[in-house]
Amino acid sequence: MSIFTFIKEASKNISQVGAVCSSSKFLAKKLTDPVDFSGKKVIVEFGAGNGSVTRMILKKMGPDSILYSFEINPVFMEKLKTINDPRLVLINDSVEDIMKYVKKHEVDYVISCLPLANFNRTFKESILSHVNTALKPGNLFIQFQYSLKDRKLLKHFFKKVNLKFTLLNVPPAFVYVCKDFTQHSH
């Protein structure tokens, strides 16, 4: 996908896309570095966009693992369909419907590229509640943002929130690595 197509889609609905450029390979690396890819894993990606993070996950994943990638933008979904990998399951649906596609506590990792800062608090809490249901206890929710706006919300939902940063993205980005849901999240 060309940069111009990405910008065109982003400008149509910036609150949905949340970015002006696709994620850099450096950001994709930061998002996937905390993941233990050994063995059979079930990984969920929220907001697959044009597939830059999707490709990095697939590159690192084992042959028996599966990646469920959610994307609601039809242009991005068409681009994602060009990725020919039997481990990839593309889902053109809201992330709130994750439980239609996975079993309770089946997911090893959730990697989110959703523009949380653009969503209202109720929707964010709904997303995190569904992540709590889908994620195996003790496993990771990894989210990137361009600001620290939702740090407090994530700390409310998770006992451990580690923050990483990369300048090598346009714009530079924060990566939250979250573990162990709190009692408040139930």
Model-flagged regions — what are they?
Residues 40-49:
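Conserved class I S-adenosyl-L-methionine
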